[in-house]
């Protein structure tokens, strides 16, 4: 009788998880504003569910609080200066890693592998689900044969966001001391080395960066600028989300063609079709009600798999710093962004609050001011 009762309880919990995940995916569908075919998203959900038991990030013995605050009230949640005591909580870090592994495995999900696709294969875009792309010969040639993170493990990892809070931080030297450095969206480093460092082991490149930072490669000058940036990576992993939306197809192909034509020394990676929904599912089941995870949150979630200690820099989604000084959205350009806009696909202040909670518990270290030794 006791065994039968346990079976019924397990079945009920399983149905609850399925219901919650499908509700979350329906929410994504409404945000994107598309209608029609659901095959691709449903298959991503099924894949996610196959790895997920409902797990919670433990903060002070309980799960992360559900947070809906999108105002600049989050500025009140200040971070202590770099010189303040911070101690790594290894027990919590390991627990988070195990929980995330129930949703995704960064070693596998960081990239689709060559053996899983062939030229001409049809892929449904993650967000434009009624649109498809064919795997091109160039894309196929650049798919890795094995995971670029296979059997990799690092003592310390730095994830460098792009907030203007990095300016005058003097964090460059500290960032470069870490075992593995992750950067976002091909952000420039040479001219900002004192504040952001130079070392790069993995850098992401959303297709929109080609439009915004390299003028859609409209002429030879812009193509040369992109080539210089790519050559500067010098063997790093270039992580290109090629399967997100239809609008990025041409830009991904342009970059792939340049890499092959000029024999650029990079290791390309193209994230799995299930990764984004798996990451979102993990945070949602921990009561962090994000919309679409930012690149920074994606990178943190992946890094828990292969990094013992994780240090975040340049994560600050507010227009003012802790001293009420203006902060640029990006340290390297004049782009404006509505952090609390309902139209934004991201919920950056909410993500920050979750990361700050983890910082306070020692699961990661979040630096938002000057680094030790900065002058």
UniProtKB/Swiss-Prot annotation:
Keyword Cell membrane: yes
Name of this chain's protein: Alpha-2,8-sialyltransferase 8B
Protein source organism: Rattus norvegicus
Active-site residues, record numbering mapped to chain: 346
Pathway assigned in UniProt: Protein modification; protein glycosylation
Gene name tied to this protein: St8sia2
Molecular function in Gene Ontology: alpha-N-acetylneuraminate alpha-2,8-sialyltransferase activity; nucleotide binding; sialyltransferase activity
Catalytic reaction annotation: [N-acetyl-alpha-D-neuraminosyl-(2->8)](n) + CMP-N-acetyl-beta-neuraminate = [N-acetyl-alpha-D-neuraminosyl-(2->8)](n+1) + CMP + H(+)
One CC-aspect GO term: plasma membrane
Residues the entry annotates as binding CMP-N-acetyl-beta-neuraminate: 162, 185, 294-296, 316, 329-330
